[in-house]
Amino acid sequence: GERVFLIGGNGTGKTTLFKILLDKVEKDSGIIHWGTNVIPGYYDQEQSDLNISNTVIDEVWNANPQMTQTEIRNALAAFLFQGDDVFKTISTLSGGERGRVSLVKLMLSKANLLILDEPTNHLDIPSREALEAALSDYEGTIIIISHDRYFINRIATRIFELSPDGITEY
């Protein structure tokens, strides 16, 4: 699938556009129509989908009860959660670790269109590399907001810039 990046200055409306596309914010006008079999999945900067009282493994397992413990642990290991790390509670995790948990959940979801808002924020270099590997293996389409030039250059198949004048493709 394609890896489309949306870039632009702070405050140009990139996150708002994503939220409009996902019907999380009311649009002023127009119609949003996804393809017949499109299932979007969203990663937001705040990781608002996490239950802070869960452990890492329970957070992912609750979202994927059909998976075995081994499958869950393998998915978590791909995002650098190994050994006793999987038993940490979400409330004790750093911002980067919470981001990795959200990304694991999203990658295991049924979504075939990933919409990622600043997924490399708060991630250290090994975590960024794990994310890059996971996205490279992902077969669906990905739309990403990012200011991370290295990440964009490594992953992007298309780049659009949002500005007050509109959208420009590069």
Task: Give residue spans per PLM region.
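ABC ATP-binding cassette signature C-motif
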Residues: 1-170
